[in-house]
UniProtKB/Swiss-Prot annotation:
Family the entry assigns: Belongs to the GTP cyclohydrolase IV family.
Name of this chain's protein: GTP cyclohydrolase FolE2
Keywords: Hydrolase
Pathway field: Cofactor biosynthesis; 7,8-dihydroneopterin triphosphate biosynthesis; 7,8-dihydroneopterin triphosphate from GTP: step 1/1
Protein species of origin: Syntrophus aciditrophicus (strain SB)
Amino acid sequence: MIDIQNLEDHRKINIQKVGVKGINYPIVVLDKAKGTQHVNASINMYVDLPHHFKGTHMSRFIEVLNEFRGEINIRTFHTILEKVRDKLKAESAHMEITFPYFIEKTAPVSGAKSLMDYICAFSGMNAENKKDFLVGVVVPVTTVCPCSKEISCMGAHNQRSHVTVKVRFKKFFWLEDIIRLVETSASGEVYSLLKRVDEKYVTEQGYANPMFVEDVVRNVAERLNENSNLTWYSVEAENFESIHNHNAYAYVEKE
């Protein structure tokens, strides 16, 4: 049978990334409290494609994933990419793994327990003379506007916010530690389950601890700077403004 992908392309244009997106795949991640956690991940995989090849072989990405079924994690990440490079005869390979991670949280007053989900990601690339790997997590928090509190006789506008942290690191660390750092760097935390006594507590706590979006990214960055295990980080915060039809945003990264 003729292999169309291997035919020569005459347009002389290299493709930096070509591959498959949105592969739903079960993986196992380490859980600080329970040991391991089984999650359903969405995986993107790419390779470079030299200008003289018409196309890549999409099925080979899935074949490699199947070889590592049950063993897709931080430790095997670059092994998988090296296998992809070899199987597709590519100079570079890239992979992005996004998954929901669940932590049991306890309501601050009633003690009610519930599961809270956080979107986490592993991403990186592997080439002959270069490797890169990042861990990312999106943490929901709340913010109360300091300006609104200052000028209002009663109350202040508040909103849910997403803080996204991405890090490069030397040694293993727990996702829970980054999540906790972020949650305690904003006006307040987000919970899946709150009783009335808890709602009162988190409302008053947020009001007593107002922050701009700028304060949140600086607070998180200041505490990440204290962690010598991290070689690089980025922090972005987005407030879903309750009194505007737009969002507030701030970004900082380690220089």
